[in-house]
Amino acid sequence: MRLDNRGLQPPEPMQRTLKALEEMNIGDKLTIINDRKPMFLFEELEQKGYSYEVNSREDGAFEIIIIKKEG
């Protein structure tokens, strides 16, 4: 699954992302693209048992790949 959150104002990117994560099964992957690094999202992901990878894009946006882990 992929979400493009560019151009959205907070808290909409985080709300969209959390809603998509609720539908994920263990091992599923979600890729989001945000205008800025979602620092508050990282805390939430760690608490809920997701791993993530952050990549800077050439256009200045950030791509975050989120994987739901067991536990």
For the regions a language model picked out, list residue spans one by one.
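Sterically constrained small-residue positions within well-ordered secondary structures
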Residues: 23, 43, 55-57
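Short, structured protein-protein interaction patches enriched in aromatics and acidic/basic residues
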Residues: 31-51
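C-terminal edge-of-domain segments
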Residues: 49-71
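Low-complexity, flexible helical/coil segments
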Residues: 12, 38-42, 66-71
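An N-terminal amphipathic alpha-helical segment
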Residues: 1-24
